[in-house]
Amino acid sequence: MAPSVKDQVEPQHAKILAIGTANPPNVYYQEDYPDFLFRVTKNEHRTDLREKFDRICEKSRTRKRYLYLTEEILKANPCIYTYGAPSLDVRQDMLNPEVPKLGQEAALKAIKEWGQPISKITHLIFCTASCVDMPGADFQLVKLLGLNPSVTRTMIYEAGCYAGATVLRLAKDFAENNEGARVLVVCAEITTVFFHGLTDTHLDILVGQALFADGASAVIVGANPEPEIESPLFEIVACRQTIIPNSEHGVVANIREMGFNYYLSGEVPKFVGGNVVDFLTKTFEKVDGKNKDWNSLFFSVHPGGPAIVDQVEEQLGLKEGKLRATRHVLSEYGNMGAPSVHFILDEMRKKSIEEGKATTGEGLEWGVVIGIGPGLTVETAVLRSEFITC
């Protein structure tokens, strides 16, 4: 006998049920990093480049970062720090096992917070731009965690920094359209593939060396959380992706024998600032058709660099402190790519509890995740916070 309408559960928006983060053990303080970089790449005699790099580091507003690479690894593999040297095989041999392991560390933290048996995970989304192999990092994570071999897997390669919001969109679709689904989302980046020695002909490398960092995030997403068992953190209400016109040269990365050869245009902050009001307005039209007071929202903005964060703040007319969680992650972790926006949400909900706020979103009801990456692609996710009951 089919259940009556009364017995059927009213479908809900997908919710983030847990967040976990992880970093490699090696901490690099920004004040010491120039000495390290110029020493290991054997460029201590390049005082001109050193002065430029010192200025970039001083303006980065990054205090420390975590990296897989060590001086010992670099000394044993000089092809990694010799600009242009064929080194892709060496890099991938390192990263193909290490990226899933870092993702596993974040996933175990999220699963522990979630508090449910791992057998309840029905879907897995794995996102990385650091390694490419078949079978992929998603397959390796299934083995590392002991997930059901029939878990539904989705692998996202080479999307870049906007993908932290992309995976929330996919997880929302899976959770809301598959009854009882519990989606484990993992983003893991180890930027060894982007590490290069220094050269006069490609100064973009100096910017990457000052900002890029390693980290992994995991979130568990599901609709209709079980009362008294699952504790939602944020509701994923609506998502939207768009390409900023005429900006594809802004962030470019090409896989070459030397690793990822990347290009970072100084126009990126201008592109983001010139379009942020438009794409946020259109994103919130999907929610209630009304423009929001931007200062009434909480924000998780991809920390691609201080100028990008400043432009978002300026163009939206945000009050001081509105991007506190974003700036904290930029300062304490650097730009970790896709995981960054999840680190920001984790920092925000923890700080909200610590400060006695009413909700996980700094005491506010509505908020937005803004992912920014190659394309330039902007991916947004409208979130609704949950009341803090503990």
From Swiss-Prot:
Reported temperature dependence: Optimum temperature is 35 degrees Celsius.
GO molecular function: biphenyl synthase activity
Family classification: Belongs to the thiolase-like superfamily. Chalcone/stilbene synthases family.
EC number, UniProt record: 2.3.1.208
Biophysicochemical property: pH dependence: Optimum pH is 6.5-7.0.
Catalytic activity of the protein: 2-hydroxybenzoyl-CoA + malonyl-CoA = 4-hydroxycoumarin + CO2 + 2 CoA
Protein name per its UniProtKB record: 4-hydroxycoumarin synthase 1
A GO BP annotation: polyketide biosynthetic process
Keywords: Acyltransferase, Transferase
Active site per UniProt: C161
Protein function: Type III polyketide synthase involved preferentially in the biosynthesis of 4-hydroxycoumarin from salicoyl-CoA. Can also use benzoyl-CoA and malonyl-CoA to produce 3,5-dihydroxybiphenyl as a major product and benzoyldiacetic acid lactone as a minor side product. Can also use m-hydroxybenzoyl-CoA as substrate, producing m-hydroxybenzoyl diacetic acid lactone as a derailment product. No activity with p-hydroxybenzoyl-CoA, CoA-linked cinnamic acids or acetyl-CoA.
Pfam families registered for this protein in UniProt: Chal_sti_synt_C, Chal_sti_synt_N
Keyword Amino-acid biosynthesis among record annotations: no
Inducers of expression: Not regulated by elicitor.
InterPro entries named among the record's database cross-references: Chalcone/stilbene_synt_C, Chalcone/stilbene_synt_N, Polyketide_synthase_type-III, Thiolase-like
Subunit structure: Homodimer.
Enzyme class: transferase
Organism (species): Sorbus aucuparia
